[in-house]
Every structure is written in C-alpha cells, then in structure tokens.
Amino acid sequence: MVRANKRNEALRIESALLNKIAMLGTEKTAEAVGVDKSQISRWKRDWIPKFSMLLAVLEWGVVDDDMARLARQVAAILTNKKRPAATERSEQIQMEF
C-alpha cells in the first residue's frame, strides 16, 4: 500500500514537472539549465520519472501554483462567472418596460 501511494505521488510530481517544462517550453528550459534542448527531451524520458520517484520517497512534493491558477481560470470560464460592474450602482442604466 505504501509503495502504491509513493508511485501515485511520483506520478503526480512527474506530471507537475512535465507541465512546467511544457508551459515554459523545452528551448527556454534548456537555456535556463544550460544544456541543449535535446538533453531536456532525454530527461523527460529517462531522468524525470526516476527523479519524481526520489522526490516522492523523500516526501518532497512539488507545488504547482501556475497549474492551480490556470485551473481556477478555466473553471471560471466554464461556469461563465460574470465580473462585477466597475461603476457605481447609480451610474448603471435601468430600463423599464
């Protein structure tokens, strides 16, 4: 059971890391790290799953604030929330029929 929980946590961490790389872009990530972009592609396949498991075993979670913010924005769009008017109540137009 503990192993399954760690595996699930590792998958969550791996997903967060891959999403961050995707949001930033492979080229920008490679430039920031100081490697070629092909190296980042190899890391995605070979190192990130292993590193994610290591982080899960060490109980070092990855907080993904950008993804949480994006999820809130998508939820607001899907629920079609209207923003409050930027005017005073007396300035709003009233129509009576």
Curated annotation (Swiss-Prot):
Residues 26-45 bind DNA. One of its GO terms (molecular function) is DNA binding. InterPro entries: Lambda_DNA-bd_dom_sf (IPR010982), Transcrpt_activ_CII (IPR007933). Pfam families: Phage_CII (PF05269). GO terms for biological process: regulation of DNA-templated transcription; viral latency. Keywords: Activator, DNA-binding, Early protein, Transcription, Transcription regulation, Viral latency, Viral latency initiation and maintenance. Acts as a transcriptional activator that allows virus to initiate a latent state. Following infection, participates, together with cIII, in activation of the Pe and Pi promoters, which are responsible for the transcription of the cI (repressor) and int (integrase) genes, respectively. Both of these gene products are required for the establishment of latency. Lambda-imm434 is a hybrid of bacteriophages 434 and lambda. The cII protein coding region is in the lambda portion of the imm434 genome. Homotetramer. Interacts with cIII; this interaction is essential to stabilize cII that would otherwise be quickly degraded by host protease FtsH. Belongs to the lambda phage cII protein family. This is Transcriptional activator II. It comes from Escherichia phage lambda.
